């Protein structure tokens, strides 16, 4: 299986492996015997065990038969010698007549020339159909053609004959795409031929040139076809173990039309669950485990990408992730950022891979020498109680693209409510709320409540309509200093709100409409309310009576915005969510259907009414389109009547249309709306706690962004811990009680249980690291492969 190509025998005049595995002997020829008259037809009759009519081995169609190995291609240029994946030619042998000048002799020569031109097609057909004897014959024929050329042209000529010009696919790739019982033997013969003619390096590392599969090599195909023996043979023969397949088929943008695996052979083996090949590649001295693809992803990024939501897939991904990380022993492999600035941990959060995210966050390695690869450390344990330290690297908001921010703000993932229940995210948010967020939330509520009270009082005691609008600074007994201060406070606070919410809206991605409708709606309503207040003030300054319309709308919207502060309480936080979801999911759809009915029936009824005389007081209320629409709307809410006016052209038809409209809208649509709203409320109630936690998490992060940098550093969570030699991490301590799990074989950072003096993160200096905790008392049993605990 691991035979080196130098151990393989050349094809001509030496031993060649027969299909059955027993080598056949080619007798060495004298120079005079090299070119017999019927060489092309009867050369292999001299080979022991050769059969004139070999049985073609039938193969099963390959997995990628259409995208990578199409057997039908139209020859447009007429140069069918360069066609990819040629059809099987007829190999009938034409006997050469005795008279070389006869017409039959000329036809025979022409047939021989056509066979030479079809040599590439015949080689590709032989390797795809598993015809070993025919392949050997064709390679000998190809080698004879090479003797007529200059030595410097031979390598290029051979590569041209062994490679499809339109796709860059070699006959070696063709053989691997059509697996059959003779594939391994065919690969050996091709490698031996390439080595004998000094083209092994070019031949084995040839890449696809077609855009869809650009960069794919024979090693990639062997791994994808799960041919471990052939993959080992190619690696031993010098295949490039760091080749990158960059075609569109392997691009994650087209994941529904292709397969993304990270481009490299190692990543392909890992993503397709082939641990033997992964081990073989990692043991190879030329394999670059830290290699990154064109998107900046390394092998761990690729594993996160292929993970799915079902258990079987996640189990093998976690095993591969574990195996690669532990065998490499390189902590930086997990901290590498791709072109989007995401580590494998952050990528798992962005893609909503909850199981993989949980595994990475809580990975605890029990072996002492590899403890630095953990993200969870057991500080001490006593019975069922243990104190765990969770690494906050790339988790807290102190870093860009933190897991916490990605999870809270990414509306493209449906399970972010579930992801926020994972540790340490759950405890981290709870500690932030207790430390500063709840106090800021209460102050914000007080200020906004006082703002609404002041706005209401100022609006209520405004000059009435019968009075002239006074100058704003004309302080009389009716308008004193208190009212002026109230108006100034309302104006200043409204300007502050408009600036704050305007910046927040500007920072939102316009393309993320779902985020705006689901999470960021309060930014818009607060901004609109503040703008209405400012607009009413300026209209009042210039003595426009229209200021009252803006003022009334601002008051109504201001008190409605108080629902935002219900998210501070779990029992009341559902009201705003229910109202939001009912409006966006149910009411908008109802209004669309209702407006269609309203306009249609309004036009119909208005068309049935004749023009009324001006002196007729009993004129129909359906005399115009606008009047008809208004009357139909009254019928919808139960305020209209079904009286028939005398001036309708067809009273029976008029009545029929009214009754139909009432049935469709008042009876059918309204009851459907009520049913849909009830279903929405029920669904929200089932996820009430998770939705409320997501609301509160977004509120916490919004308030944290408002803090200045010096204050944010004071409120930073975690403690600096020494987890290994010269390895200090900012960790979050979580005490856990597990009656089903006893920490008997886990290495502890401290022998003695109980609380210890925590290091204040804000007071740590570089010199204080020598005074950090003394660690590394272990009780584990050293094993060949360290276990992990999730």
From Swiss-Prot:
UniProt keyword list: ANK repeat, Calcium, Calcium channel, Calcium transport, Cell membrane, Cytoplasm, Disease variant, Ion channel, Ion transport, Lysosome, Membrane, Metal-binding, Palmoplantar keratoderma, Repeat, Sodium, Transmembrane, Transmembrane helix, Transport
Mutagenesis / variant outcome for changing residue 692 to G: In OLMS1; gain of function mutation; results in constitutive channel activation
Cellular component, GO, one term: plasma membrane
TM helices/strands, residue ranges: 431-460, 480-508, 520-540, 546-566, 570-608, 650-686
Subcellular location, record wording: Cell membrane; Cytoplasm; Lysosome
Membrane topology: Multi-pass membrane protein
Effect of residue 560 to L/M: Impairs channel activation by tetrahydrocannabivarin
Family annotation (InterPro entries): Ankyrin_rpt, Ankyrin_rpt-contain_sf, Ion_trans_dom, TRPV, TrpV1-4
Effect of substituting residue 557 to A: Impairs channel activation by tetrahydrocannabivarin
Tissue specificity of this protein: Abundantly expressed in CNS. Widely expressed at low levels. Detected in dorsal root ganglion (at protein level). Expressed in the keratinocyte layers of the outer root sheath and, to lesser extent, to the matrix of the hair follicles (at protein level).
One Gene Ontology molecular-function label: identical protein binding
Binding site for Na(+): 638
GO terms (BP aspect): actin filament organization; calcium ion import across plasma membrane; calcium ion transmembrane transport; negative regulation of hair cycle; osmosensory signaling pathway; positive regulation of calcium ion import; response to temperature stimulus
Effect of mutating residue 580 to P: In FNEPPK2; gain of function mutation
Catalytic reaction annotation: Ca(2+)(in) = Ca(2+)(out); Mg(2+)(in) = Mg(2+)(out); Na(+)(in) = Na(+)(out); K(+)(in) = K(+)(out)
Effect noted on mutating residue 561 to A: Impairs channel activation by tetrahydrocannabivarin
ANK repeats mapped onto the chain: 117-148, 170-198, 214-243, 261-291, 298-330, 340-362, 398-420
Intramembrane parts of the chain: 621-646
Residues on Cytoplasmic side: 1-430, 509-519, 567-569, 687-790
UniProt topological domain (Extracellular) ranges: 461-479, 541-545, 609-620, 647-649
Function field: Non-selective calcium permeant cation channel. It is activated by innocuous (warm) temperatures and shows an increased response at noxious temperatures greater than 39 degrees Celsius. Activation exhibits an outward rectification. The channel pore can dilate to provide permeability to larger cations. May associate with TRPV1 and may modulate its activity. Is a negative regulator of hair growth and cycling: TRPV3-coupled signaling suppresses keratinocyte proliferation in hair follicles and induces apoptosis and premature hair follicle regression (catagen).
Subunit structure: Homotetramer. May convert from a homotetramer to a homopentamer to allow pore dilation. Interacts with TRPV1; may form a heteromeric channel with TRPV1. Interacts with SNX11; this interaction promotes TRPV3 trafficking from the cell membrane to lysosome for degradation.
Clinical note on disease: Olmsted syndrome 1: An autosomal dominant, rare congenital disorder characterized by bilateral mutilating palmoplantar keratoderma and periorificial keratotic plaques with severe itching at all lesions. Diffuse alopecia, constriction of digits, and onychodystrophy have also been reported. Infections and squamous cell carcinomas can arise on the keratotic areas. The digital constriction may progress to autoamputation of fingers and toes.
Family: Belongs to the transient receptor (TC 1.A.4) family. TrpV subfamily. TRPV3 sub-subfamily.
Entry protein name: Transient receptor potential cation channel subfamily V member 3
Gene behind this protein: TRPV3
């Amino acid at each position: 299986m691991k035979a080196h190509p130098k151990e393989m025998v050349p094809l001509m005049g030496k031993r060649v492996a027969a299909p059955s595995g027993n080598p056949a002997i080619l007798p060495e020829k004298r120079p005079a015997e090299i070119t017999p008259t019927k060489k092309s037809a009867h050369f292999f009759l001299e080979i022991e065990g050769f059969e004139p009519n070999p049985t073609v081995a039938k193969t099963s169609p390959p997995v990628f038969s259409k995208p990578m190995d199409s057997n039908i291609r139209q020859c447009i240029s007429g140069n069918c010698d360069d066609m990819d994946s040629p059809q099987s030619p007829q190999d009938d042998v034409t006997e050469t007549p005795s008279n070389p000048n006869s017409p039959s002799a000329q036809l025979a020569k022409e047939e021989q020339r056509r066979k030479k031109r079809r040599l590439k097609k015949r080689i590709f057909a032989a390797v795809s159909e598993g015809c070993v004897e025919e392949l050997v014959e064709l390679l000998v024929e190809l080698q004879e053609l090479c003797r007529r050329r200059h030595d410097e042209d031979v390598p290029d000529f051979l590569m041209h004959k062994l490679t499809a010009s339109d796709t860059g696919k070699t006959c070696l790739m063709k053989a691997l795409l059509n697996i059959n019982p003779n594939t391994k033997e065919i690969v050996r013969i091709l490698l031996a031929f390439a080595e004998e003619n000094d083209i092994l390096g070019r031949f084995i590392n040839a890449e696809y040139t077609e855009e869809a599969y650009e960069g794919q090599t024979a090693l990639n195909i062997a791994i994808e076809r799960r041919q471990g023996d052939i993959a080992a043979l190619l690696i031993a023969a010098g295949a490039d173990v760091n080749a990158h397949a960059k075609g569109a088929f392997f691009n994650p943008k087209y994941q529904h039309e292709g397969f993304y695996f990270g481009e490299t052979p190692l990543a392909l083996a890992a993503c397709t669950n082939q641990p033997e090949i992964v081990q073989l590649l990692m043991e190879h001295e030329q394999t670059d485990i830290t290699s990154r693809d064109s998107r900046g992803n390394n092998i761990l990024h690729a594993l996160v990408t292929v993970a799915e939501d079902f258990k079987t897939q996640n189990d093998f991904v976690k095993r591969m992730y574990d195996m690669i990380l532990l065998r490499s022993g390189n902590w930086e492999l997990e901290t590498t950022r791709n072109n989007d600035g995401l580590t494998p941990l952050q990528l798992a959060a962005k893609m909503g891979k909850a199981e993989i995210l949980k595994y990475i966050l809580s990975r605890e390695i029990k072996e002492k020498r590899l403890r630095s690869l953990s993200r969870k450390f057991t500080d001490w344990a006593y019975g069922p109680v243990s104190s765990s330290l969770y690494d906050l690297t790339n988790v807290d908001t102190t870093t860009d693209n933190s897991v916490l921010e990605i999870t809270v703000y990414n509306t493209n993932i449906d399970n972010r409510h579930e992801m926020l229940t994972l540790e340490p995210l759950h405890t981290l948010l709870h500690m932030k709320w207790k430390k500063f967020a709840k106090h800021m939330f209460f102050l914000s509520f007080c200020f906004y409540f006082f703002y609404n009270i002041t706005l209401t009082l100022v609006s209520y005691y405004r000059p009435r309509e019968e009075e002239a609008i006074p100058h704003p600074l004309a302080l009389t007994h009716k308008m004193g200093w208190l009212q002026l201060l109230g108006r100034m406070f309302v104006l200043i606070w409204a300007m502050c709100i408009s600036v704050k919410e305007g910046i927040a809206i500007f920072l939102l991605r316009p393309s993320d409409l779902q985020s705006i409708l689901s999470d960021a709606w309060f930014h818009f309503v607060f901004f609109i309310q503040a703008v209405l207040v400012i607009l009413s003030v300026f209209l009042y300054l210039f003595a426009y009576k229209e200021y009252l319309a803006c003022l009334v709308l601002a008051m109504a919207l201001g008190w409605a915005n108080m629902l935002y502060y219900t998210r501070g309480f779990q029992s009341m936080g559902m009201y705003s969510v229910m109202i939001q979801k009912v409006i966006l999911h149910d009411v908008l759809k109802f209004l669309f259907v209702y407006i269609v009915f309203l306009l249609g029936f309004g036009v119909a009824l208005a068309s049935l009414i004749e023009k009324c005389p001006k002196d007729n007081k009993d004129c129909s209320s359906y005399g115009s389109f606008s009047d008809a629409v208004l009357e139909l709307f009254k019928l919808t809410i139960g305020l209209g009547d079904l009286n028939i006016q005398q001036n309708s052209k067809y009273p029976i038809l008029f009545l029929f249309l009214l009754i139909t409209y009432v049935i469709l809208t008042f009876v059918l649509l309204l009851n459907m709306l009520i049913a849909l709203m009830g279903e929405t409320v029920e669904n929200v109630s089932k996820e009430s706690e998770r939705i409320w936690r997501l609301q509160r998490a977004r509120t916490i992060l919004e308030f944290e962004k408002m803090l200045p940098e010096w204050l944010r550093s004071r409120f930073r969570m975690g403690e600096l811990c020494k987890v290994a030699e010269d390895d200090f991490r900012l960790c979050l301590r979580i005490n856990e009680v597990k009656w089903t799990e006893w920490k008997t074989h886990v290495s502890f950072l401290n022998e003695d249980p109980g609380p210890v003096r925590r290091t204040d993160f804000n007071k740590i200096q570089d010199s204080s690291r020598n005074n950090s905790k003394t660690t590394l008392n272990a009780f584990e049993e050293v094993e060949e492969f360290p276990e992990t605990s999730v």
